Amino acid sequence: MDIRNNDPGAVQYGNFFNYYQFSSAAERVKLLPDADIWLPALEDGETQKDKPYFILDVGCNCGVLTQLMHKYLEERLHRSVKVLGVDIDPRLIQRASEENESPKDVSYACVDVLDDEAFESVKTYMEVNNLEKFDAICCYSITMWIHLNHHDQGLRFFLQKLSNLAELLVVEPQPWKCYQKAERRLKKAGEIFPLFLELKWRSDVDLQIQKYLEESLDRRKIFKSAPTKWQRKICFYR
């Protein structure tokens, strides 16, 4: 984990070690919708309760929200829920694995989603579980870090890559003021995000993400949560 100038908030990839001390996972879970949003519409008489519900949680950090989301959905979907949590930071993944309360249903892997070689572990998980797509892929508060490090086209590629593997795509974009704060903290530590000034998606980045998902990836927004204390909204696209 690259912490600059002894400031735990000055990180390049959003891999905060104490993230859930200032961003309550329990409060986030309260904003999640009920079962009807998570499940696809079924034909009369069709049921999938005997099948596990598979989730990929991208940017899972140390797994606190992953664990709470797993419990939340098992209680509401009334079926087995399987979650693969991935994060770029091996120390966060180690911590998540050590504190895993449901090792039969929840697993973790150190994966950079934009690294094709690293992403093979996700594809292997899909093959082992006979998945063409995940029932849901969740991206909680990570789009900014993809954007800052991989430019507009990198963020679009990230969204497209995950959209292709998801029945339901859950995105919680950070607003532009979060970018400005991240840039200030890194600059104060003596470094910068080299691509920051080149970004075209800026003050309306959350709307640009929605527009791209709807117009380019043919997604439809079916739910938007109330704002978190950081004024972020969790959006569900099918």
Swiss-Prot record:
The keyword S-adenosyl-L-methionine applies. GO terms for biological process: methylation; negative regulation of pre-miRNA processing. Residues 1-238 form the Bin3-type SAM domain. Its EC number is 2.1.1.-. The keyword Magnesium does not apply. Keywords: Methyltransferase, S-adenosyl-L-methionine, Transferase. It comes from the Eukaryota. Coiled coil: none annotated. CDD domains: AdoMet_MTases (cd02440). One of its GO terms (cellular component) is cytoplasm. One of its GO terms (molecular function) is O-methyltransferase activity. InterPro entries: Bin3-like (IPR039772), Bin3_C (IPR010675), BIN3_SAM-bd_dom (IPR024160), SAM-dependent_MTases_sf (IPR029063). It is an enzyme of class 2 (transferase). Belongs to the methyltransferase superfamily. Probable RNA methyltransferase. This is Probable RNA methyltransferase CG11342. It comes from Drosophila melanogaster (Fruit fly).
